[in-house]
Amino acid sequence: MSIPKGPSLAVLPMADNGASTAGPQILQPSGWPAPKGYANGVAADGRIVVTGGVIGWNTLGHLPADFVAQVRQALSNIAAILAEGGARPEHLVRLTWYVVDIEEYLANLKILGQAYREIFGTHYPAMALVQVVRLVEKAARVEIEATAVVPR
C-alpha cells in the first residue's frame, strides 16, 4: 500500500492565556506562507459554541449606517454571545463574514483589523469572506457567524 505524499502539516499551539493547554491549535501546512489576520485551519477539542448570523445592531436594535461601525458592533455582539456560552475570544475556531460590498471591506481593512484586535486580541481563527447580494436586514452591510470550542 502506497501512501500519497503531500505537504507536511505543522500543528502549532495557540497563545496560552492561562487557559487550558487543550485549547485550539493552529493548522499551518509546512512550507506555506504565514497568513495575516486569519488561520488556514484550526483543530480543537471541547464544547462547541455557535452563533447565528450576527449583525451590528446594538441592544436597542439600532443599526449604524457606517460599515466599520457595523463590523465593530457585530464583533462586540459575538464577544457577548461567546461570553454567554462560557467562551472567550481565544476559543474562536471559525468566523464566516458575509458582506454586501467586498470593495468596502477591502478599503477599510486596516481599521477593521484594529477593531478586531480591540475586541478579540491577536487570536485569529480560520476565516472566510463571502460577498452576497444583500442580507435579511436590508440596512445591514455585514453579517458574521462564529464558532468557538471551549476546552473541557
Language model features with spans:
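N-terminal presequence-like segments and the immediate start of the first folded domain
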Residues: 2-93, 99-152
